[in-house]
């Protein structure tokens, strides 16, 4: 609703939109999305971005992403995994990993990162794909253990954590981002 209202706002520089990656994904999920992310907005800045993380409980049998993938290949449909919700960038990243790795695993979409993380902590799912910021505290405290991330190359804040590309899964590179946008048509002098 808010993104649609921003898209319809007068292009006078008084309305700005701060949105997550969802603003790009939503039109592919909702047939009647009230905006087009390319046509209706002028990008101003990326405010931040970080990769998604594939994480397990510390006592998980999977020491690496390769261990998890090998088990999943040998045991189709035996593993279940969580994302914050269907259609989120973590969900899409997890699906790309599943498809590119050729594994059959069951996705469980939750109603936000909080419930998905709680399910992981409670052992209700085998692994979680979530935005790094959603699991940062659990990773640092040892409540969850990261197997891989969806960024490109090694990350400065997690230099020992491999990317999924390092396991031969290419095309799954994705970040969850936060962007600042204006309605299309705002004059350039107003934007600068």
Positions of PLM-derived features:
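Cytochrome P450 core scaffold surrounding the K-helix E-X-X-R motif
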Residues: 27, 156-158
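Beta->alpha turn/N-cap motifs
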Residues: 18-23, 112-113, 130-135, 150-152, ...
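Adenylate-forming
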Residues: 3, 24-28
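Short helices/loops that flank or line small-molecule/ion binding pockets
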Residues: 2-11, 96-100, 114-124, 128, ...
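Hinge/capping helix and adjacent helix->loop/strand transition within the periplasmic-binding protein
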Residues: 8-14, 28-115, 164, 174-192
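Conserved helix-loop-beta element of the AMP-binding
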Residues: 42, 68, 143-156, 173
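Paired acidic/hydrophobic, glycine-rich loop segments that form the ligand-binding mouth/hinge
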Residues: 13-19, 80, 126-130, 145-148
């Amino acid at each position: 609703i808010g993104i649609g209202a921003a898209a319809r706002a007068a292009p006078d520089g008084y309305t700005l939109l701060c949105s997550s990656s969802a603003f790009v994904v939503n039109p592919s999920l909702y047939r009647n999305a009230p905006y087009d992310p390319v046509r209706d907005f002028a990008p101003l800045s990326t405010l931040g971005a970080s990769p998604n993380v594939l994480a397990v409980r510390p006592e998980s049998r999977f020491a690496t992403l390769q261990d998890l993938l090998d088990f999943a290949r040998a045991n189709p449909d035996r593993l279940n995994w969580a994302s914050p919700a269907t259609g989120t960038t973590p969900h899409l990243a997890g699906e790309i990993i599943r498809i590119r790795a050729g594994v059959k695993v069951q996705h469980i979409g939750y109603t936000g990162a909080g419930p998905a993380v709680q399910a992981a902590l409670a052992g209700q799912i085998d692994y979680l794909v979530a935005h790094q910021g959603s699991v940062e505290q659990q990773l640092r405290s040892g409540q969850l253990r990261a197997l891989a991330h969806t960024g490109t190359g090694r990350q400065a804040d997690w230099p020992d954590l491999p990317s999924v590309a390092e396991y031969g899964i290419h095309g799954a590179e994705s970040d969850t981002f936060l962007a600042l946008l204006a309605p299309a048509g705002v004059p350039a002098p107003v934007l600068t």
